[in-house]
């Protein structure tokens, strides 16, 4: 009872206060609000909101009063909202901050205190404008509505940026372990670009395409802060090119209200900006993934192909295709799949991982606009002045400038007009058109007939293509074995020259040529620290870092870059020149052989010969190219030293040359000679002579300069060394090419001899009929199937079987009398001989066969032991008596052969892959032929006498 009375008294008191406030005039309420502030705070607030009013007048948001009265405040008509306050902050505080003036006001403040001061000022201005909104409401201003959550997100954004930069500075000062400072974005991205990750689970990451698919999702999370559910809704048609900022890719996320599903409820616009570092650039990663997705990996997998924009009349096609491919073209990968990916990758990179940080909603996100605010704020009639100077507008492409910058790890405290660095080596147009060539095809033919979504998609792909090619030289420099470079177009001389021209200036410098991230440049622009982020280093990076002359450069060396290298002492300079010369020889040798092998490929493609022979030659050329690439890239100067030490005749010649020197005692006091050795595998006399000549020339140079001072001696040695290097490189390249060409000529001659021998043998067999047994030792047993195209099954295929012809139908018993299409069916004479011969020696199955390949060969290859009969021909003859002693074995092998024929004829698989799949299925059945046959018979019985679906079962 007592509590009820107290509640009624409080309620009556509140009602009395409300009645008193209603009875008060607007002037009294205004004065009451002003009196609630301390005098100093009231003065600060008035200063800030007076500046806001002047800014509104300057931008023509409100009219300027005719009397130019500063003290007159239009409380009743003044528009004030969270979006306008944000615009005001961007124009006057965030981007228009003058460091010179600030230093005068805060002379004793260091950088950290200045940042704190900026946040404190930001909060004070927001507080003053919130107070101004209350004053406007007193005057019944209908436009005084402030979204406090929006302004809280602005404060949170800048606090996050400054705190993160402060943490980097603090850790850098107090922590000697640079690994602690590494952001997950950098470490994960660099390691997922690396193709040589032997310890990363192949269950999830078999190819570079799967790594890039994960990396696109990871970088979308890092830059856009979207949950996995939100990322899964991004489609090709959702991404547009920025109209104001052509470097930005815009994602316009629209959500609809539950009541009106056709009417937009809220808008959220997000931006992806390019990065200087190629490995963390989301545009480069997306372009690389799409390249492998559209065109596939040669000899590994086929691509989906470029979208058919001619079929996208209403723009629905691009709205159905997700940015990442799941099991089908129109599905995004499942959340469970990517959850396993994230766990595996973070464990591999030794980074802490919390699932909610990458799959749930993030606290720091781009602002969301309701439909009315979005339409009103960006109305040209309301804010017309900024349209006259769009480059200075705080909301380019309707995205707040500071959100766009900070979300992309860039400082917002710059001017609006600050542009990204221009590429000193822009991609040549003749190379651009070779990447995603469909872009130019669509633009040349019926571009106007495409839907607007299709045209926007082509504009987007153009920007991605240019960014991709611009960063490709650096990717090639770090990871030349990446699957992207399996595409033959990147091996031609034009691309190789562009790659070399863009990266050659960085050779020898301990500093990277591109920026990393704000706050991390001081640490990770050093190549040694950057390489240390790799869990498994590629061979060429391991070699380069071990020969880096300066692993810990000073601050002066970091700023001066390659110029500092000229001041190194003689030993370091000699090592540097030696390494650069060796790398140059490697590059020239590799590029020249790639050109040579491409010419051979074209020649053999034009020659008239049997398809299987041409395929074999091209296959051998490709194997030779791969082997050559690996050997040249993995070769080191030390390998040449070891080769000469192990070669006794060359050692003796070197000793003779050393003993013939004019002054042995003087020579023993000199520093160790630099010897540039041949990279060729041969040990001919020319390499020894060149090495000896180089030694004699070096001795004569040093003898002539013995009496001069050290500086003159160094400069003369450098000039002489340069000339000798040029001469030596030319001689070594010609020697190496000559030797390799001789070896290649021998291989080609042997190959052609073998092909001619086989062809002659076949002609003789056709002429002589049954006498083929005499020449059977000249060739390998052949299966009679035509070579099918490689459809990219995800299994390693042992390239053993070589067959010709194609099966027409599956194998059946001789009762069915169904013939099979072969290229060399036995002649009637052979059938007669077979019948007479089987009376003498009965046909039998070989019980010692222990491989699928052996079973297939026995089934279709004529056997001289049984009058050139095979299982297939015996079935055609109608004689079943030979099966009496091996009926169970025959039925067992028949099931296996039927599955093999199904793979070749119905699934259109390459015969090598078909054999390999059978072997893998056999391994799953404990390696037993009988268990395999039983499994196959059961599958056919359960699936309407068909093997349909078995491949899908195996792949899962």
From Swiss-Prot:
Subcellular location: Nucleus; Chromosome, Centromere; Cytoplasm, Cytoskeleton, Microtubule organizing center, Spindle pole body
Record-level GO BP terms: chromosome segregation; kinetochore assembly; mitotic spindle elongation; septin ring assembly
Record's compositionally biased regions (Polar residues): 819-829
Modification sites for Phosphoserine: 566
Pfam families: GCR1_C, NDC10_II, Ndc10_N
Modified residues (Phosphotyrosine): 706
Keyword Cytoplasm: yes
Predominant location: nucleus
Record keywords: Centromere, Chromosome, Cytoplasm, Cytoskeleton, DNA-binding, Nucleus, Phosphoprotein
Chain intervals with Basic and acidic residues compositional bias: 549-559
CDD domains: Ndc10
Segments traversing the membrane: none
Record region (Disordered): 544-564, 653-672, 679-715, 810-837
Keyword Nucleus: yes
Function comment: Acts as a component of the centromere DNA-binding protein complex CBF3, which is essential for chromosome segregation and movement of centromeres along microtubules. CBF3 is required for the recruitment of other kinetochore complexes to CEN DNA. It plays a role in the attachment of chromosomes to the spindle and binds selectively to a highly conserved DNA sequence called CDEIII, found in centromers and in several promoters.
Subunit annotation: Component of the CBF3 copmplex, which is formed of CBF3A/CBF2, CBF3B/CEP3, CBF3C/CTF13 and CBF3D. CBF2 strongly interacts with BIR1. Interacts with the central kinetochore protein CTF19.
Stated name of the protein: Centromere DNA-binding protein complex CBF3 subunit A
Protein encoded by which gene: CBF2
